[in-house]
Amino acid sequence: MEISTESSARLDREYAQPFSVQLKEAVHRVFLSYWRNPTYISSKLFLNLVGGLFIGSSFWGQGDKTSNASLQNKLFATFMSLVLSTSLSQQLQPEFINQRNLFEVRERPSKLYSWVVFLLSQAIVEIPWNLFGGTLFWIPWYYMAQFGRESSRAGFSWGMYMIFQIYFASFAQAVATVAPNAMIASVLFSTLFSFVMVFCGVIQPPRQLPYFWREWMFYLSPFTWLIESMMGNFIHDKVVRCLPDELNDVPTPPGTSCEQHMDLSLIHISERAGKA
């Protein structure tokens, strides 16, 4: 009996279906799995909504102010919006590991679909839920803090936050991929993510970071560029006006003008900086 070339090629394939069919069916299956797990979905959405209300109310109206203190409040409001991702990631990882265990026990031995298809399906299904949950967080956070009424400013902020949703979810899944269980995945993620948060220049200014970390980890941290872009968007075209209690009175010595005294002070500061 002769076998055609096409039939022979099909017999030589590792999987019964091509990559596109595998991915389509795997994505559909994971969507159904998520839909049948309302505890995971509701906890994700609830945490985003409550987090947005809590952080937004904590920094109420700070985005509309232009004092020196309000700039710091804007910075920490932005930073706190990113810190929430640690809790969301630790919700995500056990679900991912349960799906992975099922794949390794049943799907991989039976050659239903490949490891790449499994990873892509998990990442794809997380995206719409994270975008929806991130929007639930962003609306109260942005408008309660009053970062700006302009549509361009709001749209840019929302877009950057949606990119961040995809980033932290994929990062958490990548860590869970190499972890044997959810507990170790949580420890690994917290350890690695702490580097991203600590060396982004918010908790400690870049100039005060140790030289070793400042020269590479500060620039490597995605938080550095994300916070910089969001803060640049919030303070663009806004004039900073210090409040009276934020100004320091500088008494001048007798016989010198304010200009002369400040010139001498600047020279002294420059010399000290040069020695340092």
Question: What residue ranges belong to the model's regions?
Answer:
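Short, membrane-interfacial amphipathic segments enriched in basic
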Residues: 5-25, 215-222
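Membrane-spanning alpha-helical segments of multipass transporters and channels
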Residues: 35-266, 270-272
